[in-house]
């Protein structure tokens, strides 16, 4: 039971656990919570006061959500943080995906540890203006499973919010776990009083993913978190033709033969201009209209599509920004366009 919440099994005329008469009034007689309410400390939760003080130095707070796992939410969170840092903003990235912390890998910070100073826990820094906090920095090894129930997860989220010293930062990006679970309720409860800019929801095009995204949108509306928009990730596979592998199927044996060199040689000889085109294919069924149609139906902004790009996957594996080295020629422009809709007043640097 959180401070101030009336328990579901309370008596009909419950005065509320924060009332001076909590556990003492006539209406409390026979209530299963009578003793707990009578002895509970009254007044504001001191942790919420501490969180408000910490968050007072954070200008903007953005939640990154998804209905399902595996849709690229953490990849988007990482690249959003890289992009904001590339705009010369001071950025913090908080990973509250307690059971699946992939942010340390995607920021190139595996093996790093949290340090403590007289100001609190210090984030692990990728760059001078990009700090990261994750439970991944607290595990003895990256294969260690986190088997925690809700209260312990909520306790760590609260500790991240009240004990991590970010300093004066422009953006705090919060990478949440998929779905709508204890972690989501906690982060909203703790952050909403301090001001949340809103949530970006990441999905893939197929209906099986969008079903859960609708629930995510509904959650945001119920708890009062603005939906900044929905990103359709993995919107078709796109890559330069010269990077495509060509296979000849041997139907009799079920095996296949790599004929890539033969195909590229043939194109180079007979149609070299085709080597510069981009090959695209639909990976997920978007016949239902995808995220764009869902956004129209639910009245939330559609931020855009990000194609499935092997180079973006490689950047995530290597913990690098997709906006550097001009390698993510397919995905980087799409991500840049989406991020500029969220942060319209700032132009991204190349």
Curated annotation (Swiss-Prot):
<dbReference type="GO" id="GO:0005829">
    <property type="term" value="C:cytosol"/>
</dbReference>
<keyword id="KW-0004">4Fe-4S</keyword>
<dbReference type="GO" id="GO:0042803">
    <property type="term" value="F:protein homodimerization activity"/>
</dbReference>
<dbReference type="InterPro" id="IPR028601">
    <property type="entry name" value="NUBP1/Nbp35"/>
</dbReference>
<feature type="binding site">
    <location>
        <position position="28"/>
    </location>
    <ligand>
        <name>[4Fe-4S] cluster</name>
    </ligand>
</feature>
<feature type="binding site">
    <location>
        <begin position="67"/>
        <end position="74"/>
    </location>
    <ligand>
        <name>ATP</name>
    </ligand>
</feature>
<keyword id="KW-0067">ATP-binding</keyword>
<feature type="binding site">
    <location>
        <position position="37"/>
    </location>
    <ligand>
        <name>[4Fe-4S] cluster</name>
    </ligand>
</feature>
<comment type="subunit">
    <text>Homodimer and homotetramer. Predominantly homodimeric.</text>
</comment>
<dbReference type="GO" id="GO:0051536">
    <property type="term" value="F:iron-sulfur cluster binding"/>
</dbReference>
<dbReference type="GO" id="GO:0016226">
    <property type="term" value="P:iron-sulfur cluster assembly"/>
</dbReference>
<keyword id="KW-0411">Iron-sulfur</keyword>
<dbReference type="InterPro" id="IPR019591">
    <property type="entry name" value="Mrp/NBP35_ATP-bd"/>
</dbReference>
<keyword id="KW-0547">Nucleotide-binding</keyword>
<dbReference type="GO" id="GO:0140663">
    <property type="term" value="F:ATP-dependent FeS chaperone activity"/>
</dbReference>
<dbReference type="InterPro" id="IPR033756">
    <property type="entry name" value="YlxH/NBP35"/>
</dbReference>
<dbReference type="GO" id="GO:0046872">
    <property type="term" value="F:metal ion binding"/>
</dbReference>
<protein>
    <recommendedName>
        <fullName>Cytosolic Fe-S cluster assembly factor NBP35</fullName>
    </recommendedName>
</protein>
<feature type="region of interest" description="Disordered">
    <location>
        <begin position="1"/>
        <end position="30"/>
    </location>
</feature>
<dbReference type="GO" id="GO:0051539">
    <property type="term" value="F:4 iron, 4 sulfur cluster binding"/>
</dbReference>
<keyword id="KW-0479">Metal-binding</keyword>
<comment type="similarity">
    <text>Belongs to the Mrp/NBP35 ATP-binding proteins family. NUBP1/NBP35 subfamily.</text>
</comment>
<feature type="binding site">
    <location>
        <position position="14"/>
    </location>
    <ligand>
        <name>[4Fe-4S] cluster</name>
    </ligand>
</feature>
<comment type="function">
    <text>Component of the cytosolic iron-sulfur (Fe-S) protein assembly (CIA) machinery. Required for maturation of extramitochondrial Fe-S proteins. Functions as a Fe-S scaffold, mediating the de novo assembly of an Fe-S cluster and its transfer to target apoproteins. Essential for embryo development.</text>
</comment>
<dbReference type="InterPro" id="IPR027417">
    <property type="entry name" value="P-loop_NTPase"/>
</dbReference>
<feature type="binding site">
    <location>
        <position position="31"/>
    </location>
    <ligand>
        <name>[4Fe-4S] cluster</name>
    </ligand>
</feature>
<dbReference type="GO" id="GO:0005524">
    <property type="term" value="F:ATP binding"/>
</dbReference>
<dbReference type="Pfam" id="PF10609">
    <property type="entry name" value="ParA"/>
</dbReference>
<dbReference type="InterPro" id="IPR000808">
    <property type="entry name" value="Mrp-like_CS"/>
</dbReference>
<keyword id="KW-0963">Cytoplasm</keyword>
<keyword id="KW-0408">Iron</keyword>
């Amino acid at each position: 039971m959180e401070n101030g919440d009336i328990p579901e099994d309370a008596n009909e005329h419950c005065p509320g656990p924060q009332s001076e008469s909590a556990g003492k009034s006539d209406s409390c007689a026979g209530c299963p919570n009578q003793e707990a309410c009578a002895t509970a400390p009254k007044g504001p939760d001191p942790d919420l006061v501490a969180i408000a003080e910490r968050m007072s130095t954070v200008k903007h707070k953005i939640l990154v959500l998804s209905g399902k796992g595996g849709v690229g939410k953490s990849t988007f969170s990482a690249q959003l943080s890289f992009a904001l840092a590339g705009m010369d903003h001071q950025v913090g990235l908080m990973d509250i995906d307690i059971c699946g912390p992939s942010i340390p890998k995607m920021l190139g910070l595996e093996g790093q540890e949290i340090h403590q100073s007289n100001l609190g826990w210090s984030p692990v820094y990728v760059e001078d203006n990009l700090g990261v906090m994750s439970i991944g920095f607290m595990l003895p090894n990256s294969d260690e499973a986190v088997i925690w129930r809700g209260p312990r997860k909520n306790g760590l989220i609260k500790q991240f919010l009240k004990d991590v010293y970010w300093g004066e930062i422009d953006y705090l990006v919060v990478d949440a776990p998929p779905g709508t679970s204890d972690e989501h309720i906690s982060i909203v409860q703790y952050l909403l009083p301090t001001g949340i800019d809103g949530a970006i929801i990441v999905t893939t095009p197929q209906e099986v993913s969008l079903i859960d995204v609708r629930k995510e949108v509904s959650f945001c509306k119920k708890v009062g978190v603005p939906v900044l928009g929905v990103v359709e990730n993995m919107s078709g596979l796109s890559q330069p033709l010269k990077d495509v592998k060509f296979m000849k199927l041997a139907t009799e044996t079920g095996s296949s033969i790599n004929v890539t060199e033969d195909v590229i040689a043939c194109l180079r000889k007979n149609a070299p201009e085709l080597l510069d085109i981009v090959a695209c294919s639909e990976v997920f069924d978007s016949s239902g209209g995808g995220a764009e149609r869902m956004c129209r139906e639910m009245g939330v902004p559609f931020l855009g599509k990000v194609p499935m790009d092997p180079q973006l996957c490689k950047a995530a594996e290597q913990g690098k920004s997709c906006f550097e080295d001009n390698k993510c020629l397919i995905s980087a422009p799409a991500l840049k366009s989406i991020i500029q809709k969220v942060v319209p007043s700032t132009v991204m640097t190349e």
